Every structure is written in structure tokens, then in C-alpha cells.
Amino acid sequence: FARLGRPWQDAQWLSLHGRDPAPLAQRLQQRPSALAVLTDPSRGGVDEVRQSLRSSGLESAYALWLCESLGHSSERVQRLAPCQATPSDLHPLHLVVLLAEAQAAPPADQLPLFGLEDGVFLQHSDRPGLMTKREVRIQLLAELNLPARGVLWDLGAGTGSVGLEALRLRPQLQLLCIEQRSGGSPLIAANAARLGVQPAAVLEGDAMEELPNLPAALAAPDRVLIGGGGRKRRALLEQVIQRMAPKGEVVIPLATLEALAELKPVLEAAKYSVKVSQQQAWRGQPLADGTRLAPMNPVLILKGSAPRQDGA
């Protein structure tokens, strides 16, 4: 870190020396600000680090510094751009330092229509990695069955990734984002600007307290994503059901069976049509001369569709 002119106090360390690179992929999901990776000239080397960055969609989120033969006359420290090949004369004694970079806003018209990489979104500095991952986000957007127009609530919006990507797909939607975490509102607003979209409202606070005070135009949602709620999730779902527009739908990603067991009866009691599924994805990670599939956390998805009213 002295060679890079950067303090080391906030740095994390990880050894891949002769090891499976899977722990590196897991650590990258936490989005450390600085990560020193002890590498190996064979297995667990700089190429495995680069492959892990690509597989995680974070290649542009980190500056990769290759440090060779430190403290010797042949010492060499250089930054490798994503498009730059690994040096053919790589010294066997080397390590890699990854430094998080503030990413420039990508041109909105150059982004893909669907399935944005995780690295596109700015994240909470105190909880990096706390966002809906791309694979889950794609599934949630499909489950929301987005209408061309209407009101979409994203409750417990986090970085705003799901709601904002929905707004790119359906620009005529009125999007309401509510996030309780401090700094959530400016973060979502910044991500909206990066994606070239404009939510109808972004609120910072407890959803249970914010919903009763919504303007009339946003008071009856056509689609709702509940990404948070914690211990209040049952009461929050009950309030959503009371406010749902005719033919409305609610989608709830869950981490535990207990949460599913708590919320599913609430939808059934309201005569909602209920669907339960699980999203499980794997990402390719380097393994020796090949590729292994590293599992991501499974997510349960609970979906409820409001009962049709007579004549609907």
C-alpha cells in the first residue's frame, strides 16, 4: 500500500495461495474498499482474480494493481486495465491489490435494456453488497408483470435497483421508492440519475409510517415489491393489501421459510391467488485450468395477485 500511496488501515486481506478462488468471489460481494490478494504463480494467481472480477460483474468497479517482486531490484508495480493482458513475463512472486473506484455514470443510452450488471449501481458505503443481485432482480422483474402504466411501490428499496430497472422497462410507471436506511434517498436518486430515469417519489423512513401520507396519485399501487420490513413485514403486507388497486400484484423476495410461512396465509386470507417459487443461481468461478459453478444465496419468491372484482 505504501507503493500505491494509499493508507492500509481499511484494507482487507485474502490468500488464494494454492486455494480455490471461491472465497474471493464471496468477498467481492461485500464490496471492500481495498483488498490485498496473496496469489500463487500457478493456482490462485492474478488470472483467477481477474476472472472472479469479470464473473461478479465488478471489473469496472475496481482498479487492479499487480505488485511483483516487492522489495527486490526487479520490483514492478503496475495497474492492469480490464482490456490489458497479464504480462507474459509475470514474476512468480506477486500479489494483487484491488482498490474500489468511484464509477463514472455510464451513458444511459448505452446500457442494456434488461439485466443491468450489479456494478452499475452505487451502493451503501457502510453495507456494500447489500443489494438485489442481478439474477434475482431479473426474476423479480418478471414476476412483477409490469403494466405499461400505473403505480409501482418499491418498499425497502435498498439501492433502488429493482424499481429503477422497472422504470427503464416501463417509463410511464409512477415509481415510489421507500428505504429506511440512512442515506437511502440520495443513493436511490443518484442511481436514478445514472440510469436516466425519474421516480415519482423517493422517501427515506419507515414504510409503515410513510404510506398513510402519500399523495392521492400514488396511494393505490398496481404493483408492489416488498424488499424489507423485518419484524413489521406482516403488518406492512396487510397495509399493502388494503391499498392495492384492482388487479394489483405484490411480489416479496424472502430469505427464510419462516418468513414464507408468516406471509403466505396473509395473502390467502385476503383471497389472493398465491404463487411460491425459489430462485437459485450459480456464477462461474475459476478452478485450476477450468471453471466451477459457485452457488449464490437462494431466494424464496412469494407472489400474490388480488382477486378479480365482479365485472372485472
What positions do the PLM features span?
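Active-site capping/gating segments
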Residues: G71-L95, A259-A261, V266-D310
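Conserved SAM-binding loop of SAM-dependent methyltransferases across substrates and taxa
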Residues: T159-P171
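S-adenosyl-L-methionine
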Residues: I178-A220, K232
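Short beta-strand element of Class I
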Residues: Q172-L176
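Helix-to-beta-strand junctions that scaffold the AdoMet/dcAdoMet cofactor pocket
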Residues: R170, M244-P246
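Class I SAM-dependent methyltransferase SAM-binding "motif I" and its flanking Rossmann-like core
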Residues: F1-R31, M208, A269-A294, P298, ...
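Conserved class I S-adenosyl-L-methionine
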Residues: R149-G158
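A contiguous loop/helix-start segment that scaffolds small-molecule binding in enzyme catalytic cores
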Residues: S33-P128
